[in-house]
Amino acid sequence: MKVIEVLSSSKESWEDATQNAVSQASKTVKNIKSVYVAEQSAVVDGDKVTEYRVNLRLTFEIK
């Protein structure tokens, strides 16, 4: 197994940011087995959250 760190963001939610990271990573990394959300943050403009950010660790199997 190998672990890589991935940063991702979304205008919608932390869940969407996580899915975006997995979708993008799976284009070049095969056999992703799990994702661990290490950090969550958000960008705020005025009184609105404008961007959700996640710092993830993706675990994948090396064959």
PLM features: residue spans?
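Short, well-ordered alpha-helical segments
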Residues: M1-S34
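Soluble periplasmic/extracytoplasmic beta-strand elements of cell-envelope proteins
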Residues: E5, Y36, N55-R57
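A cross-kingdom feature marking charged/low-complexity
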Residues: Q40-K63
